[in-house]
Amino acid sequence: MPIIFVFLLFLFIPFKDVYSNDEYFRTLRNDKVNLRQGPSFDYPIKIFYKKKFLPVLIQDSSENFRKIRDHENNTGWVHISQLSKKKAAIVIEEQLIMFSSATLYSNPVAKLKEGRLVTIRKCKNDWCKVETGEYKGWLKKSGLWGLL
Protein backbone atom coordinates (compact mmCIF):
# COMPACT_ATOMS: atom_id res chain seq x y z
CA MET A 1 0.00 0.00 0.00
CA PRO A 2 2.75 2.59 0.83
CA ILE A 3 4.41 1.89 -2.53
CA ILE A 4 1.18 2.72 -4.38
CA PHE A 5 0.83 5.95 -2.37
CA VAL A 6 4.39 7.00 -3.19
CA PHE A 7 3.84 6.19 -6.87
CA LEU A 8 0.62 8.25 -6.97
CA LEU A 9 2.33 11.10 -5.14
CA PHE A 10 5.11 11.25 -7.74
CA LEU A 11 2.59 10.93 -10.55
CA PHE A 12 0.71 14.08 -9.54
CA ILE A 13 3.57 16.36 -8.48
CA PRO A 14 4.54 18.72 -11.30
CA PHE A 15 8.31 18.28 -11.02
CA LYS A 16 9.15 20.85 -13.67
CA ASP A 17 7.37 23.64 -11.77
CA VAL A 18 8.54 22.65 -8.30
CA TYR A 19 12.13 21.64 -8.86
CA SER A 20 13.10 23.49 -12.01
CA ASN A 21 15.95 25.99 -12.09
CA ASP A 22 15.13 26.92 -15.67
CA GLU A 23 15.15 30.60 -16.48
CA TYR A 24 12.04 32.09 -18.02
CA PHE A 25 10.68 35.51 -18.98
CA ARG A 26 7.94 37.57 -17.39
CA THR A 27 7.02 41.25 -17.68
CA LEU A 28 6.55 43.95 -15.08
CA ARG A 29 2.86 44.25 -14.20
CA ASN A 30 2.82 47.92 -13.15
CA ASP A 31 4.23 51.32 -14.12
CA LYS A 32 6.12 51.48 -10.81
CA VAL A 33 8.12 48.45 -9.64
CA ASN A 34 10.91 48.31 -7.04
CA LEU A 35 13.97 46.15 -7.67
CA ARG A 36 15.39 45.19 -4.28
CA GLN A 37 18.81 43.94 -3.18
CA GLY A 38 17.33 40.86 -1.53
CA PRO A 39 14.18 38.72 -1.38
CA SER A 40 12.21 40.73 1.19
CA PHE A 41 10.60 44.14 1.64
CA ASP A 42 13.27 44.74 4.32
CA TYR A 43 16.00 45.02 1.68
CA PRO A 44 16.77 48.44 0.17
CA ILE A 45 15.57 49.40 -3.30
CA LYS A 46 18.29 49.29 -6.01
CA ILE A 47 16.27 50.48 -8.99
CA PHE A 48 12.83 51.98 -9.48
CA TYR A 49 11.32 50.76 -12.78
CA LYS A 50 8.81 53.04 -14.50
CA LYS A 51 7.94 50.90 -17.54
CA LYS A 52 4.90 48.62 -17.55
CA PHE A 53 5.39 45.31 -19.43
CA LEU A 54 9.19 45.60 -19.42
CA PRO A 55 10.49 42.03 -20.00
CA VAL A 56 12.63 40.51 -17.25
CA LEU A 57 14.41 37.16 -16.99
CA ILE A 58 13.50 35.16 -13.87
CA GLN A 59 16.66 33.52 -12.52
CA ASP A 60 15.77 32.34 -9.01
CA SER A 61 13.00 32.35 -6.42
CA SER A 62 12.65 32.72 -2.68
CA GLU A 63 9.14 32.44 -1.24
CA ASN A 64 7.15 35.32 -2.80
CA PHE A 65 10.12 37.02 -4.46
CA ARG A 66 11.80 36.36 -7.80
CA LYS A 67 15.36 37.23 -8.74
CA ILE A 68 15.31 38.99 -12.10
CA ARG A 69 17.71 40.33 -14.72
CA ASP A 70 16.70 43.09 -17.13
CA HIS A 71 17.98 43.82 -20.66
CA GLU A 72 20.72 46.07 -19.19
CA ASN A 73 21.98 43.23 -16.92
CA ASN A 74 20.66 44.80 -13.70
CA THR A 75 19.78 42.08 -11.19
CA GLY A 76 17.73 42.07 -8.02
CA TRP A 77 14.52 40.86 -6.44
CA VAL A 78 10.87 41.75 -7.08
CA HIS A 79 7.67 40.55 -5.41
CA ILE A 80 5.64 38.09 -7.50
CA SER A 81 2.63 40.44 -7.44
CA GLN A 82 4.65 42.80 -9.67
CA LEU A 83 5.11 40.22 -12.46
CA SER A 84 2.86 39.39 -15.39
CA LYS A 85 2.74 36.58 -17.98
CA LYS A 86 2.04 39.08 -20.77
CA LYS A 87 4.67 38.66 -23.50
CA ALA A 88 6.82 41.61 -24.52
CA ALA A 89 10.33 42.22 -25.80
CA ILE A 90 12.91 44.99 -26.22
CA VAL A 91 14.58 45.78 -29.54
CA ILE A 92 18.32 45.16 -29.06
CA GLU A 93 19.58 46.04 -32.53
CA GLU A 94 20.44 49.62 -33.46
CA GLN A 95 17.64 49.53 -36.05
CA LEU A 96 15.24 46.65 -36.61
CA ILE A 97 12.93 46.62 -39.62
CA MET A 98 9.33 45.55 -39.06
CA PHE A 99 7.80 43.68 -41.99
CA SER A 100 4.17 43.11 -43.03
CA SER A 101 4.72 39.30 -43.14
CA ALA A 102 7.16 36.84 -41.62
CA THR A 103 9.64 37.13 -44.48
CA LEU A 104 12.36 39.54 -45.56
CA TYR A 105 10.66 39.79 -48.96
CA SER A 106 7.48 41.40 -47.59
CA ASN A 107 6.85 45.13 -47.34
CA PRO A 108 8.69 47.04 -44.60
CA VAL A 109 6.30 48.65 -42.11
CA ALA A 110 8.65 50.58 -39.82
CA LYS A 111 12.21 50.93 -38.53
CA LEU A 112 12.38 50.43 -34.77
CA LYS A 113 15.26 51.81 -32.74
CA GLU A 114 17.17 50.03 -30.00
CA GLY A 115 15.30 50.05 -26.69
CA ARG A 116 11.80 50.09 -28.21
CA LEU A 117 9.29 48.00 -26.23
CA VAL A 118 7.05 45.73 -28.32
CA THR A 119 4.11 43.54 -27.32
CA ILE A 120 4.34 39.98 -28.63
CA ARG A 121 1.18 38.60 -30.26
CA LYS A 122 2.62 35.29 -31.51
CA CYS A 123 5.88 33.77 -32.70
CA LYS A 124 6.48 31.47 -35.65
CA ASN A 125 9.92 29.98 -36.31
CA ASP A 126 12.40 32.92 -36.33
CA TRP A 127 9.72 35.63 -36.44
CA CYS A 128 7.33 37.28 -33.98
CA LYS A 129 4.17 39.23 -34.73
CA VAL A 130 4.30 42.36 -32.58
CA GLU A 131 2.59 45.66 -31.83
CA THR A 132 4.15 48.92 -30.72
CA GLY A 133 2.42 52.26 -30.80
CA GLU A 134 0.53 52.50 -34.09
CA TYR A 135 2.66 49.82 -35.79
CA LYS A 136 1.83 46.13 -36.22
CA GLY A 137 4.01 43.65 -38.06
CA TRP A 138 6.68 40.96 -37.91
CA LEU A 139 10.19 41.19 -36.42
CA LYS A 140 13.11 38.76 -36.48
CA LYS A 141 13.51 37.10 -33.07
CA SER A 142 17.27 37.62 -33.18
CA GLY A 143 16.76 41.39 -32.80
CA LEU A 144 14.65 41.07 -29.65
CA TRP A 145 15.41 40.53 -25.95
CA GLY A 146 12.68 38.90 -23.86
CA LEU A 147 12.11 35.59 -25.64
CA LEU A 148 13.55 32.13 -25.17
Give each language-model segment a name.
Residues 40-43:
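Second-shell loop/turn segments in exported
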